[in-house]
Curated annotation (Swiss-Prot):
Cofactor binding mode and count: Binds 1 Mg(2+) ion per subunit.
Identification of the protein by name: Ribulose bisphosphate carboxylase large chain
Cofactor: Mg(2+)
Gene from which this protein is expressed: rbcL
Listed GO CC annotations: chloroplast
GO MF annotation terms: magnesium ion binding; monooxygenase activity; ribulose-bisphosphate carboxylase activity
Residue(s) carrying Phosphothreonine: T330
Originating species: Olimarabidopsis pumila
Length: 479
């Protein structure tokens, strides 16, 4: 480090560069109940001690900068600085460490996920002293949680609105995701809902393109919802994607959905941004709309094990910002998702109090102090043969969201929906009778095929489909 140069001697100020660990590495610190706690996976550059790397993360994500500044004397750094209070090695990784950082609550604006992330992950990830950096988990204290509204409605209120209990909800993403006219799109929605699904869904990149403007889509989908409700006697919904280029346009689309009387709208919360998402969530609560959240772009942030941000952090942020559903992987489908890790952040979405459990990737005990829960959505490459595993893994409080697994049925969309509904009802009944879905799942589906030709045809089509690829983002071995 450069030698310090003494200036402004009369006020005790020493200019120059000093090691971060002298100020920001404080292993003696006892965390407070009001601190936001972060667990970072740190990969220092060669020659950088882990204590210096952890302290650098704490400094650059709170009050520090690369050199001493005389305005440090105008505030109380001990009150406002982040502190690296513990460092532990990652089992099996010689160059990686978990650095635990505590942030005073006063560093963050109330009710703002945007400000929280701007502080904690906004700048430090490009720091040259680090080869890589990943935010593995956050502990959000009750004092901060209470400044957020959270999900517009939550799990129980949604079930009451829909009058659906005792089973997972069923959905389908309309395919092809792009290119259909609004009228043909509405037809597909109607066929799926009439066949037995609870929801259909806009794909994440369906906004308002030349082939299908948003207002036309909303109108034809509303017609499909009302027609299918009249024919089935069940409440139906379609996730109308309100995501737009501006917040004002997004709210305009949500207002139109409310005027049509539909039950739910949708938002792409990462590409749309947390400020937009929180605004839409507040509107949905005030106006009785459910809010479905898609996580488009998440894998850019969370897939690599040594750099970025784990999805459990994005899931916690979504629960604060607000959403009634969020896509959470499938474990068994075509998209990335380790089973234990997925179960960990599914609990973080749904439950009120979650104990620390490193075997599931949960670094901190999290108390949501009665903030409403979020329904996890299993979506991506799933079909009827996956139904027993999905029911066993996710339980009743979930949405099982098919796409090609409904619309790819050889007899059409409505028979595809029938096959999904029959498979789900068979699995729920078998589970309620005490059968083990993990062991007897295939047999349960085969038995149901005997009285559902639609399910039998679906099983024949997808009997050979597998997505057997190793998971990239796996949990660490626990020593």
């Amino acid at each position: 480090m450069s030698p310090q140069t003494e200036t402004k001697a009369s006020v005790g100020f020493k200019a120059g560069v000093k090691e971060y660990k002298l100020t920001y590495y404080t292993p003696e610190y006892e965390t407070k109940d009001t601190d936001i706690l972060a667990a970072f996976r740190v990969t220092p550059q060669p020659g950088v001690p882990p204590e210096e790397a952890g302290a650098a993360v704490a400094a650059e994500s709170s009050t520090g900068t690369w050199t001493t500044v005389w305005t440090d004397g105008l505030t109380s750094l001990d009150r406002y600085k982040g502190r690296c209070y513990h460092i532990e090695p990652v089992p099996g990784e010689e160059t990686q460490f978990i650095a635990y950082v505590a942030y005073p609550l006063d560093l963050f604006e109330e009710g703002s996920v945007t400000n929280m992330f701007t502080s904690i992950v906004g700048n430090v990830f490009g720091f040259k002293a680090l080869a890589a950096l990943r935010l593995e988990d956050l502990r959000i204290p009750p004092a901060y949680t209470k400044t957020f509204q959270g999900p517009p409605h939550g799990i129980q209120v949604e079930r009451d609105k829909l009058n659906k209990y005792g089973r997972p909800l069923l959905g389908c993403t309309i395919k092809p995701k792009l290119g259909l006219s609004a009228k043909n799109y509405g037809r597909a929605v109607y066929e799926c809902l009439r066949g037995g699904l609870d929801f259909t869904k806009d794909d994440e990149n369906v906004n308002s393109q030349p082939f299908m403007r948003w207002r036309d889509r909303f109108l034809f989908c509303a017609e499909a919802i009302y027609k299918s409700q009249a024919e089935t006697g069940e409440i139906k919904g379609h996730y109308l994607n309100a995501t737009a280029g501006t917040c004002e346009e997004m709210i305009k689309r949500a207002v139109f959905a409310r005027e049509l009387g539909v039950p739910i709208v949708m938002h792409d919360y990462l590409t749309g941004g947390f400020t937009a998402n929180t605004s839409l969530s507040h509107y949905c609560r005030d106006n009785g709309l459910l809010l479905h959240i898609h996580r488009a772009m998440h894998a850019v942030i969370d897939r690599q094990k040594n750099h970025g941000m784990h999805f459990r952090v994005l899931a916690k942020a979504l629960r604060l910002s607000g959403g009634d559903h969020v896509h959470a992987g499938t474990v068994v489908g075509k998209l990335e998702g380790d089973r234990e890790s997925t179960l960990g952040f599914v609990d973080l979405l749904r439950d009120d109090y979650i104990e620390k459990d490193r075997s599931r990737g949960i670094f901190f005990t999290q108390d949501w102090v009665s903030l409403p829960g979020v329904l996890p959505v299993a979506s991506g490459g799933i079909h009827v043969w996956h139904m027993p595993a999905l029911t066993e893994i996710f339980g009743d409080d979930s949405v099982l969201q098919f796409g090609g697994g409904t619309l790819g049925h050889p007899w059409g969309n409505a028979p595809g929906a029938v096959a999904n509904r029959v498979a789900l009802e068979a699995c729920v009944q078998a589970r309620n009778e005490g059968r083990d879905l993990a062991v007897e799942g295939n047999e349960i589906i085969r038995e149901a095929c005997k009285w559902s030709p639609e399910l039998a045809a679906a099983c024949e089509v997808w009997k050979e489909i597998r997505f057997n690829f190793p998971t990239v983002d796996t949990l660490d071995d626990q020593a």
